[in-house]
């Protein structure tokens, strides 16, 4: 998480960047590892209620914090805690959203594969994801099907509010 937060705080982006980390009670020292940055808020996660998956429950708690502490944020970046972002990542995502008038943009980040099983399964996951949701197809505004890589998604706040947040997909 420390490398993720650092990569977000060091973005070449003209706008303000605020990071909210939900510490879901893991024993990996999330709060300490996240570091001490201006505009970083670490919030303790609450127990996982029935009907929610862990990741979406953490996202929902983070979004609650955004609504309280960043009510004027135009965009919200939802990202996994093990992704190291390139220095222009946020600027590129915002530029794509604005230039193409998209409500949500995502990117398939390079996933770290260190163990034998990660090296075996991660490429297969990406291959099958691309087969199920061909990138040109799901990126076509005229297509009835859309997909996003859940590890890095930038969404317009108004769009997220209009669809009711993540609660309606909480068990997926």
Predicted region positions:
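Cell-envelope/extracellular polymer assembly enzymes that use nucleotide-activated donors
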Residues: 18
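Long helical/loop segments within the catalytic core of UDP-sugar-dependent glycosyltransferases
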Residues: 44-69, 74, 93-163
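Short, well-formed alpha-helical segments that are part of the catalytic scaffolds
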Residues: 1-10
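Donor nucleotide-sugar recognition loop
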Residues: 146, 165-172
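A conserved acidic beta->alpha catalytic loop
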Residues: 7, 14, 23-32, 46-48
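Acidic donor-binding/catalytic loop of UDP-sugar-dependent glycosyltransferases
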Residues: 29, 79-96
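A short, conserved beta-strand element in the Rossmann-like catalytic core
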Residues: 25, 82-85, 111-112, 154
